Design a protein with these regions (language model features):
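Internal gly/pro-rich beta-alpha loop/helix module
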Residues: 121-122, 127-220
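Small-residue (G/A/S/T)-rich helix-start motifs and N-terminal tracts that mark the onset
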Residues: 1-79, 179, 190-357, 361-386, ...
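Short, flexible loop segments at the rims of nucleotide/cofactor-binding pockets, characterized by
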Residues: 101-105, 131-136, 303-308, 330-333
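Short low-complexity, flexible loop/linker segments enriched in glycine and/or proline
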Residues: 90-92, 170-172, 292-296
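Nucleotide and nucleotide-moiety/phosphate-recognizing core
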Residues: 37-127, 135-157, 342
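Short secondary-structure boundary/hinge segments and terminal tails
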Residues: 84-85, 112-115, 164-165, 287-288, ...
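Short acidic loop-to-helix transition motifs that present clustered carboxylates
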Residues: 108-111, 161-165, 188-189, 359-362
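Generic structural signal for alpha-helix starts
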Residues: 86-87, 115, 137, 160, ...
């Protein structure tokens, strides 16, 4: 796993590295060298480097110097003369580079900048670093849209200029990079809000050869789950296994209005590996669900006049749930009074539980001042997983603003830390999904935009249930297990986008692609670890 840092954590880590003997000036040289080497992989004949006033610009000056030494024609666009750059380190390398075989253009007009961009094979963005926030000012408010309109290939150093490295928010405009070469560790803003849209492919340069020894000296905002981290979850089934030892799941879901949610969750749990899946649904929709799921038993639960779980549902559901290895509650169940009673009853059972969708909305209605103010309501010995998207998560913490990855992680941690249980994990769903446990936050593979479709969350909930039921012995690493499930959902999303087109994917497309997604994920895990098939030519 690869740490993801906040801007404050990056500053602390650089200070530690400096105390260990590598100065900020040396880090700038290493950053510029790494960026230059990544640009050289694109085989450019001519490169345009845009620099700003600070140390990110210094990285750009160093990169320009190295590219020139490698035989690349280099133009540098600067807002001021090298001697006028306010940052001391950047001013030093700018003076040095300006005396070499490069062309420096100070404060060009828009037309002059367009000409320079048109000549370049690659544009290097070294305008702003991780300290940028707020609004763009001239000349950068002119440079950035001009680059976006005219450049064919942009490589940003550390973060795309205009992006808030902490929140991922773009207030005005931002460089749209094909590649972002980030230094020491990825920044949290690259995965949050607008970050993924503007950053392009991410490449991380460690810069410091003892980074692994010191990076744990600072807290991590999160960690990226890499394909090889999941390799243990792709082991083949034992030949002597039976359906019950593969794990049993009860799906408590559905209503007359939303029967499909229960159907999709149940099918997904089965496709994810559970050996025995059953559904407990209101009797108003039970027959419809039975017809759609011929291989899955369906329990008809007393319903109310609107076809949701009724007043007698709690006792019936809880009695059934005791017999299962895992319970998923919530998809399509509404927030009726009976549904709220079912949720509170399941929380009291000694069984692994996943709360999704309306089950979370029921919780929010029960605890109107935020569930983090009522941790006894959800503190339990058995595993508990909550899967809110941003709006649901905001309701759970009584309206705290949740609109990007950083605020989602903060809200999820409020819920987890209030309970103080190693068995509680909140999966904050978004463009980048965060798996938040009491001690760590993991960022698994993000899926395509096509996953933003109704019912996609029901499929993910089913995958989580099937995964938890099948692998309950993973008690020491719940977050990684759930990262595996989220990654499968993402892989299925990519497969569906390829099969049907990004804009045409519907949630049911994902279900039959869960199996193929496992195969692709397993292959990626082996490749990430450098393990090849015996028949490979490599």
């Amino acid at each position: 796993m690869k740490p993801v840092l906040s801007t404050e954590e990056v500053v602390r880590l650089e200070d530690i590295i400096e105390r260990e003997g590598t100065s900020k000036a040396e880090l700038m040289e290493l950053a510029g060298e790494f960026a230059a080497n990544e640009v050289l992989k694109l085989n450019p004949d001519r490169v345009l480097v845009l620099v700003g006033f600070g140390n990110n610009g210094g990285d750009g000056w160093v990169a320009a110097d190295i590219l020139s030494h490698k035989g690349v024609d280099v133009d540098i666009v600067s807002p001021v003369e090298p001697d006028e750059i306010p940052a001391a380190l950047a001013r030093h390398v700018a003076r040095r580079t300006a005396g070499r075989d490069v062309h420096v253009c100070v404060g060009p007009s828009r037309d002059e900048l367009e000409v320079l961009i048109d000549k370049a094979d690659v544009v290097v963005d070294a305008i702003f670093g991780t300290g940028f926030h707020g609004n763009l000012r001239a000349p950068f408010s002119i440079w950035i849209p001009t680059v976006n309109e005219c450049a064919d290939c942009v490589v940003s150093i550390d973060v795309p200029s205009g992006l808030n490295a902490e929140t991922g928010v773009v207030d005005d405009d931002c460089i749209r990079a094909e590649h972002t070469v980030t230094m020491i560790a990825p920044k949290i803003g690259l995965y949050s809000a607008d970050g993924p849209e503007y950053a392009g492919d991410l490449i991380c340069g460690n810069l410091y050869d003892r980074l692994d020894e010191v990076i744990d000296d600072v807290d991590h905002a999160a960690e990226i789950v890499e394909p090889g981290d999941l390799v243990d979850y792709f082991a083949p089934l034992p030949t002597n296994i039976d359906k019950y030892s593969r794990g049993s799941v009860l799906i408590v879901a559905g209503s007359a209005q939303y029967p499909g949610a229960a159907i999709m969750a149940a099918k997904s749990a089965a496709r994810a590996g559970a050996g025995y899946v059953a559904v407990a649904a209101p009797d108003a929709c039970a027959n419809l669900i039975r017809m759609a799921l011929p291989s899955i038993p369906v329990f008809a639960i007393p319903s109310d006049s609107r076809g949701s779980f009724g007043a007698a549902a709690r006792m019936t559901v809880c009695e059934i749930a005791k017999k299962y290895g895992c319970v998923l509650c919530g998809p399509g169940m509404t927030t009726s009074a009976g549904a709220m009673q079912v949720v509170s009853g399941l929380l009291e059972l000694d069984v692994p539980l996943i709360l999704d969708a309306d089950a979370l909305n029921c919780l929010a209605k029960i605890a109107i001042d935020g569930i983090d103010s009522n941790p006894e309501m959800y503190r339990r010995e058995q595993p508990l997983v909550m899967t809110p998207h941003y709006r649901e998560l905001s309701r759970l913490v009584a309206g705290d603003e949740v609109n990007d990855l950083g605020t989602a992680i903060a809200a999820a941690q409020k819920v987890v830390w209030a309970a103080g249980s190693d068995n509680l994990v909140v999966i904050a769903k978004g463009p980048t999904t965060a798996i938040c446990g009491v001690e760590r936050v993991l960022l698994p593979l993000s899926g395509p935009a096509s996953l933003a479709t109704a019912g996609s969350g029901d499929v993910l909930a089913g995958i989580l249930a099937g995964t938890l039921a099948t692998m309950r012995d993973e008690m020491d690493r719940w977050e990684l297990l759930y990262s595996y499930a989220v990654a499968l959902h993402s892989y299925a999303g990519f497969a569906a986008a390829t099969e049907y087109g990004e804009k045409s994917v519907i949630a049911t497309d994902l279900i039959d692609l869960i199996g193929p997604a496992m195969e692709v994920a397993a292959k990626d895990a082996l490749e990430d670890l450098g393990i090849m098939d015996e028949g490979s030519d490599d």
